């Protein structure tokens, strides 16, 4: 066998191997996506069993995000800034502009919106507000102002799932345990 035939055989073998590996990867991705959709449907059924209506579509994408270090500008209005396409928000009535400064060193895996919905419902400990209807679900960077003083200059924003219902906002930390 000469060298050119050997090279051709090796190239064909590598191409076939790449095609097989790509097919296995896509198959696994589709299965994972289907499982996340089933988990979202299951979480909606769980919510409805607990008396919570879910009219919003639960996101099924899986992300990794870092924490975000922010500073507060008390002279500015309540302008909402974004970081990586996600709004940076604070719980409560913070009368300051939240300015993204820098990211943490490592990206953390986030829980699915379906798991966050179950955590939200379980957090009510059996006293779910009457007529609770989840109208919107979104991923945000969240500053929990209940843990810091009103005159703080800096804080940490974490990825969180925000659930909106009739003007009320509920935040569930999105980092996996």
Predicted regions, residues:
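General structural signal for secondary-structure boundaries
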Residues: 2, 75-78, 108-115, 171
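A broadly conserved detector of short glycine/acidic/proline-rich loop/turn motifs that flank catalytic sites
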Residues: 143, 167, 176
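Short, surface-exposed beta-strand/loop "edge" segments at domain boundaries and coil↔beta transitions
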Residues: 97-99, 168-173
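Conserved histidines in hydrophobic membrane contexts and catalytic metal-binding motifs
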Residues: 159-164, 172-177
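Residues in well-ordered beta-strands of folded domains
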Residues: 20, 138-140, 164
């Amino acid at each position: 066998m000469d060298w050119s035939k050997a090279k051709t055989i090796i190239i064909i073998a590598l191409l076939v191997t790449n095609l097989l590996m790509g097919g296995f990867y896509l198959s696994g991705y589709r299965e994972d996506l289907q499982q996340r959709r089933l988990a979202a449907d299951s979480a909606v059924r769980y919510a409805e069993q607990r008396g919570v209506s879910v009219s919003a579509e639960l996101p099924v994408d899986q992300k990794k995000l870092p924490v975000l270090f922010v500073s507060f500008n008390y002279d500015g209005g309540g302008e909402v800034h974004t970081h990586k396409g996600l709004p940076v928000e604070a719980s409560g009535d913070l009368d300051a502009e939240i300015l993204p400064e820098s990211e943490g060193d490592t990206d953390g895996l986030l829980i699915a919106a379906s798991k966050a919905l179950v955590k939200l419902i379980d957090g009510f400990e059996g006293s779910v507000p009457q007529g609770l209807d989840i109208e919107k679900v979104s991923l945000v960077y969240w500053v929990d102002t209940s843990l810091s003083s009103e005159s703080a200059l800096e804080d940490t924003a974490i990825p969180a799932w925000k659930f909106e219902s009739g003007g009320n906002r509920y935040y569930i930390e999105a980092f996996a345990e």
